[in-house]
Amino acid sequence: MKHLIIVESPAKAKTIKNFLDKNYEVIASKGHVRDLSKFALGIKIDETGFTPNYVVDKDHKELVKQIIELSKKASTTYIATDEDREGEAIGYHVACLIGGELESYPRIVFHEITQNAILNALKTPRQIDMSKVNAQQARRFLDRIVGFKLSSLIASKITKGLSAGRVQSAALKLVIDREREIKAFKPLTYFTLDAYFEPHLEAQLISYKGNKLKAQELIDKKKAQEIKNELEKESYTISSIIKKSKKSPTPPPFMTSTLQQSASSLLGFSPTKTMSIAQKLYEGVATPQGVMGVITYMRTDSLNIAKEALEEARDKILKDYGKDYLPPKAKVYSSKNKNAQEAHEAIRPTSIILEPNALKDYLKPEELKLYTLIYKRFLASQMQDALFESQSVVVACEKGEFKASGRKLLFDGYYKILGNDDKDKLLPNLKENDPIKLEKLESNAHVTEPPARYSEASLIKVLESLGIGRPSTYAPTISLLQHRDYIKVEKKQISALESAFKVIEILEKHFEEIVDSKFSASLEEELDNIAQNKADYQQVLKDFYYPFMDKIEAGKKNIISQKVHEKTGQSCPKCGGELVKKNSRYGEFIACNNYPKCKYVKQTENANDGVKQELCEKCGGEMVQKFSRNGAFLACNNYPECKNTKSLKNTPNANEIIEGVKCPECGGDIALKRSRKGSFYGCNNYPKCNFLSNHKPIDKRCEKCHYLMSERIYRKKKAHECIQCKEHVFLEEDDG
C-alpha cells in the first residue's frame, strides 16, 4: 500500500511528488480544512472553558472525503504541513477529521522543499505538537472574540462595516498617533553657520564663546547674523585632527519582517506581494535541476542558518572573492525577538549553487528580483565587514569652533556583493596647529519638518520592534486596514482616513488595552508560553475574556453613538422627540432619535412612491410599505398593537425566469424562487437538478474554474462572484 503525505498547497504537493517514488501519494489540504463557523461566534463558552464549533467549509467537503479515503488505503499517513503554529493546527485538524489516535500520524517537517530535505524529514518524524496547536487555537479564539464582539459594538456606535481587532487596532493606533503628531507639528526655523575654508574644507559652527551649540538651538536670525559678523573677523587654525578605523558590520540574513522592508524600499513591492512571490519560490519553481523550492520557509522570525548552508556559503566566498573576504569562522546571528522560534531558519537560498543568473531563463522578472535580493543578502551575511576610516577636523578661533567630518572606504568587504550607496567624503590633507584661511561664512536658515508618515516597510519594522503580531500577520494586517477603509497607501505613505480616528478614539477611551502596544506584546508572550507548554491556553483565554466582556457590556451603555442622522424637522407623535432618517439593511426609514427609549418608526416618503395606500381590514389603520430580507410588503402602521401584513402584488414573482442565463448543471432555465427562509435562484428542473444560488446568476464564466458567476454586493462593493469556487472580481465604480 502507498504512503500518503498531506501538505497545504497544491504547488508544494506537486514539487514534493517529483522527489518521491510511486510508493508515495501527495495531496494538498488547500489551507485550513475546517474553521470556526462564519455566521456565529463559533465558540461555546461556559464554566468548563472554551469549546470550538469547527465547521468544514463547503468548498472543502469533497476534498476532505478524498483525503479520508486515501488515508484509509494508505499504510502510513504523514502530516507535512508547515512547521509554524498555523501549519501545526492545519495538520491537527486534518488528523482529527480522518479519525483515530493523533499519535498514529507521523509529523514531518522541513524548512526547504528539496529532495534531500524531504527524504531526511521522512527518516525523522515526530508527533503533532499539541502545545503549538493550542497556541494557534488560543490566537484564533482571541481574534474571533475581539473581532466578533468589538466589531459589532463599533459598528452599532459609528456605522456598519467597521471593525476592530486585537492586532489590527494596535497597528491602526500607531498610524493614528503619527497622524496626530503631524497635525500637532509646528515648524521651527533655525540657523546654522557654515564656513568654507581654503583648500576645500566645509565645516559647521559647533561652539561659540566656550558654549556648545545644540542642534536647532540658534533660532534668532539677528543673533545668528551677529555671530557671523564677529567670526568673520577672526583668524583660524587647525585645532585637532582625529582619524579612526570603523567597521560597517555585515547585515544578517532575512527574516520575514526585514525581507518585507527591503523588498518595499528596494523593489517597490508591497508586503502582500512580497509574501506571495516568496511563497512560490519556497513551494517550487522550474530550475536547471528540475522543479524545486529555491528558498527556505518565508514566515520566520529566526536568524538561524543550517550548518551545511554556512559551509556552502563560505566555500562560495573563498572561491569567487578570495580569502580576504572570508571571515575566520562562520557568522552566527540571533534575533532581537526573545520569543523567536529558533527551530526555524532565516530566509536563504536552498542551494548557493543556484546563482540568480542561472535562473534568469526560468523565473518571472519579479520572482528573479526577489530571489536575487535573498541570495545576495545571505551570501553577504557571511562575508567580512567593510572597513572605513572616519576623519574629524576641528578648526578653531578665539571665539568659536567649527567641525568637519569625512569618511574613506579602506576595504569593501560585503559591499562587494551588496554595493555601497555612500560616497566617500574625503577631507584635504591638513596638519594640526597649521593656520587656515576663512574663505566664506554663511548664515543658513532651515525649517524643521513634521515626522514622516509610515511606509508599509517602516510600519512593519515598528510592529516587530513592539512585539505586535508575528511574521505571518504583518502583511495581512496592513491589507485588512486598507480593505476596511481605515488607511490608504499613496506613494508608499500610509495615511489614516476619518473613520479610523473615530474608531481609535472609542477604543482609547473604553478599550485601552486593545490599542496598547505593551498589552498586545504581552499577549503575544502568553501565546509563546502556550506554544512552549509553559501556560494553559484555557486559562489565558479566561483571563482575557471575562474582563473584556465586562467592558463590552459597559460600552453598550456608555459609548455615545456617533452616527449622523439627517433631521426631518418633524416631531415624534409618541414622545415629542425629533424624527430623523436612518438606514438599515432593508433601506431608509424615519425613526425617533430617542431610540431605544422610544421605538416609533415611520416609513420614508420615497419608500411609498407608486404603492397604493390601503386601510387595514383588521383595525382600520393605514397599511404602509415596509421591507424585509424577502422584499417589500404592506404592514399596519399600528404595529405592534396590530400585526397585520400583506404581500405586495408588484413584488417580483416566484419562478420569474432569468433571461439569457442557463443552468450550468443541466442547461435548464434559472428562476427566482422563494422559501420561508428567503428568496434564492434555482433550476426549474428541480428536483432532477439541485442547482441553486443565493445571488442572481449572470451570463459570465469564472476565469478560475469556468463555472457560472453571480452578481452581488461583497464587502460594500459591487462584485461578480463564482457560484462554485467563490472567486470574486470587484467592479469599477463609474466616476460620474
Predicted segments with their positions:
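Basic, low-complexity terminal or inter-domain segments flanking catalytic cores
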Residues: K2-H3, T15, K22-Y24, L97, ...
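Intrinsically disordered, low-complexity regulatory segments
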Residues: M1-R140, K149, L218, K423
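Short acidic, hydrophobic short linear motifs in intrinsically disordered regions
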Residues: I241, T250-A263, Q289-M298, P450-V462
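A short, conserved structural fragment
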Residues: Y282-T296, R484-K492
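Metal- or metallocofactor-binding catalytic centers and their adjacent structured scaffolds
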Residues: K214-P252, D434
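Short, hydrophobic-biased segments on the C-terminal half of alpha helices
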Residues: M275-Q279, I478-S479
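C-terminal or mid-to-C-terminal helical accessory/interaction module adjacent to the motor/catalytic core
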Residues: A117-F197
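Conserved short loop/turn motifs at secondary-structure junctions
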Residues: M1, D82-E83, T159-S163, K243-P252, ...
